[in-house]
């Protein structure tokens, strides 16, 4: 009986470790592809006299004329996520590009001690996707090839573009 319990515990731990490794590998592959294909950012900004006054002032303070355009940014986030009506701890990494508007957001949301939901949102080549798996193994969401999701992912990209002045 002890042997069966040991084997079951080993299999569960192995599945969790393998799920994490496969999930991270996929996310890292997407990031490598985005890093290699950032496209060409705009050479120059719009003339400041064509912008509304508050926007022109913002750009004057944040974007000196000799500054090169931002091509990509990597963000790390820690916080809480509203899941099933209660807030729970989460960590995330996000990689965003500007030449070809794209992002990947890879999060771990705590379900219970030692048990996370892995979530990956992407916006690449005009298409959004959302994938989530418990412990990186059991799928709980897999959404893609959806015009509403594409639109939502683009809106998120534009909303987060302030990180890339």
Model regions and ranges:
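N-terminal Sec-pathway targeting helices
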Residues: 1-16
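N-terminal cleavable signal peptides for secretion/export
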Residues: 14-93
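Detector for Asparagine
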Residues: 28, 84, 116, 145-146
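Short linear motifs at secondary-structure transitions and domain/linker junctions
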Residues: 47-54, 80-84, 105-109, 153-164
């Amino acid at each position: 009986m002890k042997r069966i319990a040991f084997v079951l515990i080993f299999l569960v731990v192995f599945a969790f470790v393998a799920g994490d490794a496969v999930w991270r590998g996929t996310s890292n592959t997407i990031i490598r592809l985005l890093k290699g294909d950032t496209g060409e950012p705009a050479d120059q900004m719009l003339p400041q006299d064509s912008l509304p006054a508050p926007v022109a002032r913002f750009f004057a303070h944040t974007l000196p004329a000799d500054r090169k355009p931002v091509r990509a940014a990597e963000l790390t986030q820690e916080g809480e996520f509203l899941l099933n009506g209660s807030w729970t701890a989460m960590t995330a990494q996000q990689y965003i590009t500007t030449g070809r508007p794209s992002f990947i957001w890879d999060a771990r949301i705590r379900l219970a001690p030692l048990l996370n939901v892995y979530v990956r949102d992407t916006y690449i080549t005009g298409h959004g996707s959302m994938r989530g798996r418990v412990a990186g193994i059991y799928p709980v969401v897999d959404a893609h090839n959806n015009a509403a999701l594409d639109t939502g992912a683009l809106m998120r990209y534009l909303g987060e573009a302030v990180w890339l002045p």
